[in-house]
Amino acid sequence: YNDPIFNEFGAEKFKINKLHESKFIEEYKWKKDSQVLGKFEINKWTSDFGDRTDWEEVGEIGISYSLKYARMYGGDLQGIKEKIPYLKELGITAVWLNPVFLSYQNHKYGANDFRHVSPDFGTIRTSGEKHGVEISSQNEHGNKSYVEVLGIDAVDNSEYKLLEINLKGENKGKNGYGETHDPSTWVWTESDLIMVDVIKELHKNGIRVIFDGVFNHSSDRHWTFNMVLAEGSESKYKEWYKFSDFTHHVKIEDYHSDQEAYEILIENKKNVKYNGWAGFDTLPEFNTFNQEYKDYIFNITRKWMIGPDAIESEDWMNDDGIDGWRLDVPNCLENQGFWNEWREVVKSCKKDSYITAELWGNAAGDINKGNKFDTVMNYEWLKTTIGYFINQSSEGGRRYKLKASDFFNELREKRTWYPYQSLQSSQNLNGSHDTDRLYSRIINDRAGRDLEEGKQLEQGYNSIRPDLASVYHPNTTIDWKNIQIKPKDILKLISIFQMTYIGAPMLYYGDEVGMWGATDPYCRKPMLWEEFTYDEERNPSHVNQGEVYDQKADKDLFQWYQKLIKIRKENSVLVYGRFKEILNDDE
């Protein structure tokens, strides 16, 4: 992992294949509002991101909430497979997939079930196919496919319904596949098999795959959390979470109807007390000291790394398991010793596996002992790079000049933080799903993450297509119209540095074709594809909203990134060589 070119994306916004769109609408359970249930629809891929659909209007959902958590565009794993030639043409050699596990959220950073891929990414209704995937009868983390388990019911069955947990009765605590937390009961669903097929195809094309690991918390619909809501303090899963009060809990009994059980579940969620990540009751925190919880996550890790064939291939390009993990908010786990144990599991699955952590700031304490993470998402590299090339204040307000000497000094200091091997494999990112788009940051005086999350546009952030800043520039101290250098030129300068510095360059999906936007959710628009014709976008900024312009992929920028990646690959000194600064002056 010293020489990858990373690409980050999630299936939901990358490419829609449309094989199951109508079935998705029919099956998807959005329980926000009874009115919305009858109106739910997939948002048009090529629409203006700011437009509301009928179901959003009827449900009276605030637009920013809907954009972040509720609306769906229908991107799927088949779409990723279809675009593997595109990734290969660009020069990508590793992909970080945003969460793929079962979740009703569009971003899936709160999982309902880590055992399985979300049906909206795979298939909504089963087909009876195995997608060319072989499953070992000796696999300790699932030795059967859904076809063997369901028999004649393996065709045209609802995968969503099969994954629902039984809250009462003789099958209490099991889903439609008969699974429990015991890995010997686990089954490979059709969506799981589709995911494995995509992994294998990416590997065949020289592209490694890392999953997003979100192990600090689950969604409030995770099956173990729901079992606690159903059973109360008697539940064997109670200690998996941080519950503190069951005083007003009502136990779900076998004599309750399904509707009564559901209503009790909802009331229990309101009445019991538990810790939620960052105060969100929709994201209950795990008790990471609990051994059964740890074993569950360790077995999840083994399932997806070893793959259905249960062996580590000598050649990773022939392997059917993932190659590593990107860890979400790993510093939030109360039990930091969890990561030491988890690392041993990962490295026992694959010797050349890769573990990168979402850590902001100096993370030497988590990297340098070699017993937690291999490396980091290098936000500190991005911060210094932006400070020099964009000359942007970290506190907001007017731009200031970060001198060349200061730029070099910051880089030099940050290179001392980690061992050289960790530096070489650190993800030098130009942005992510948590930041505003780099292209948009260039034309703004304040970075999106410097403002209250979700409030950038209200506070004057300009989210117009950046190449139009020379015509329209209300929120910048630079007069783009009357200077020779343009936002795209600065973007290209940054890309040159990114592709020639120590570390693993990482592109956020669509940056290579000039995608723009403020931070979440506006940095998470559907991918711009050259073959699609998009509706015009109305500037979503809260100033001069009347500006309307085309949405289109920038082919010139794609070719630019393609050329730079090729240069990096053909010159190993850019990957393995030492970095030395040559300072001219600070003018």
Regions found by a protein language model. Name each.
Residues 1-2, 96-107, 213-222, 328-333, ...:
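Short, solvent-exposed turn/loop segments enriched in Gly/Ser/Thr/Pro and often Arg
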Residues 3-68, 223-295, 449-479:
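Glycan-binding loop/region signatures in secreted carbohydrate-active enzymes
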Residues 4, 8-32, 37-53, 361, ...:
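Loop/helix patches that line or flank the sugar-binding groove of alpha-linked glycan CAZymes
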Residues 6-22, 27, 105-129, 141, ...:
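Aromatic- and acidic-residue-enriched segments that line the glycan-binding/catalytic groove
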Residues 198-199, 203-207, 216-217, 225-232, ...:
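Active-site-proximal helices and loops of the catalytic beta/alpha 8
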